[in-house]
């Protein structure tokens, strides 16, 4: 499926697709006729999974819809976690592979990039790979989404979850930090989940207190469109000038450092082949090749 609105097909009544730009399309009938083995055979290559701008359900890309202010004018809660990338970064990252990949990908900007995402050891290379994925795939996207809510009147409430769920030594996720989905049991006040990665956690009173607070925010938001209420730390609507988020760590506070976007702006926004659109602080990139092949490299690791 295509997630880029600039790449569309001209499907005629015979069901034939005409490729107008990358990636290549095939007729819907052919896709429906594919066997399960055919589908499973190509599944490992489908790194990205995003909405398709089909001109009907989605008349345009999500980015363009928000840029034009055509999204539903309703409040939103959005956010990301401090260590989103730990669950998506392979252990096979190597020091040489990481450094060579950065130099190949970023050319004259490589040294600046490496100063921001350094790698002097295999462990540091892996940690930097985690940070790249966390920033580019989650942190940047959530911040951009919050900024683009300026095109409508409803507010966005941005959070940054940095609490590391406690886990017994030896647990498969014990060293994953504030990993992808770590906030979910807190939000729904349910520490009894039995599926990984949130099972077998040694949640304590700090966790239960955070959970009570987060669940209250979500209940208030569902009822009124505003997460705030009596006894809760004030959660301000996102203001691009203040650039703050509600940080949920060992305590709850409003924090500018939680956004952690200085490094992604510095390291990525000035790359020569990326066109940054400064419109209410939002950024996009110019081509399918740049957008998707670059992120595929970042996601899969250079090692």
What are these language model-derived features?
Residues 6, 10-13, 28-35, 52, ...:
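Residue-level detector of intrinsically disordered, flexible termini
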Residues 6-8, 131, 285, 293:
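Short linear motifs centered on Gly/Pro in flexible linkers and helix caps
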Residues 8-206, 217:
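Substrate-gating cap/lid region and adjacent catalytic-acid/histidine neighborhood
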